[in-house]
Design a protein with these regions (language model features):
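Bacterial N-terminal signal peptides
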Residues: 1-7
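Sec/Tat signal peptide C-region and signal peptidase I cleavage site
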Residues: 8-13
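Subset of outer-membrane beta-barrel
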Residues: 14-319
Length: 319
């Protein structure tokens, strides 16, 4: 049982995709969808994403192109490290009117069977989940804000704990966008999000901090013609808690859109390896038609990175 507990601890903390051996519910830091993953997690200032509730809910209030949408994402996490880890994500939103938006999301993180207890012969299979609802509003022209409530449940499969534990957390977001003069359709945007503000998860024999994060980011959208469009974005993040992994990270990437229907993406994430935040590169592609879209992303990292060669697949629809 001790060995199995160590096995869980080894993978239990992944910050921004990442930190190791610290904190609880770190599946919340895994990039939630393929577009965001292809941009190395730089999503705090991007519009047009059904998964905005996980990134910055305020961005969706500023998006005038659709009334609602939903998507599903599958991530076989750490597939090179050990099979069986996976993240399933559902995200969506609905605009009540031109200024007010309701958002919803659900994430389920599955572990492989890690072994069998000596007593009772029960298999050990930890699992974690989060269910969340959010509200976003356009306060004034170009400026939006959001708030998200999140319920988190963590069950480490009786490894050192008699039962699962739960807690709640909140996110706060803000978003500003403005048109660029003398270039039709061009704009720049800035976003801010503070995520997972809440109490520790209290297990029967211990308590663990949530992966609290602050992010600020910016992007520029440049439609050169109806056939060619370029978007560039960057995020600066700071891990606020747990205290032993406080560190700065940076993500930057670009998205090229061809003929309005085909997207190609690439990005790089720089992190502090000593804090468990590995640096990595990502690439991805997507296509959309009649409101539906399909996106894919792939992560490249060094051989000592446990989540190298992870991929994301997202299927979504907006109207």
């Amino acid at each position: 049982v001790i060995a199995l507990g160590m096995s869980v601890a080894t993978v239990y903390g992944q910050d921004e995709v990442t930190a190791i051996n610290t904190g609880a519910a770190n599946f919340l830091t895994i990039m939630p969808d393929a577009r965001t993953a292809a941009l190395a997690g730089a999503g705090v200032s991007l519009t047009g994403n059904e998964n905005a509730i996980f990134l910055n809910g305020a961005t969706i209030a500023a998006d005038k192109n659709c009334r609602g949408g939903a998507s599903y994402t599958y991530v076989p996490w750490m597939r090179d490290y050990q099979s069986g880890y996976s993240l399933h994500t559902l995200g969506g939103f609905y605009k009540i009117d031109e200024k007010n938006v309701i958002l919803a999301g659900f994430r389920y993180y599955n572990y492989p069977k890690l072994g069998v207890l000596e007593t009772g012969g029960e298999s050990i299979r930890p699992k974690e989940l989060a269910a969340e609802v959010g509200y976003a509003r356009e306060l004034i022209k170009n400026l939006s804000v959001s708030a998200t409530f999140r319920y988190i449940y963590s069950d480490m499969g009786k490894v050192g704990n008699d039962r699962g534990a739960s807690t709640v957390a909140f996110d706060l977001g803000a978003f500003y966008t403005k048109a660029i003069a003398r270039m039709e359709g061009a704009s720049w945007s800035a976003g801010l999000q503070v995520s997972n503000l809440g109490p520790k998860i209290k297990y029967p024999k211990s308590s663990e901090s949530l992966p609290m994060m602050a992010k600020v980011g910016g992007s520029v959208d440049l439609p050169f013609s109806q056939m060619h469009r370029l978007m560039m974005t960057a995020d600066l993040g700071y891990r606020l808690a747990p205290s032993d992994v406080q560190a700065v990270n940076v993500s930057a990437g670009a998205e090229y859109t061809l003929a309005e229907h085909f997207m190609f993406r690439g990005a790089y994430h720089y992190g502090d390896k000593e804090k468990g935040d590995h640096s990595f590169a990502t690439v991805g592609a997507g296509m959309n038609r009649y409101g539906g879209h399909l996106d894919f992303a792939w992560l490249f990292a060094s051989d000592d990175c446990p989540f190298r060669n992870t991929f994301w697949a997202t299927l979504g629809y907006s109207f």
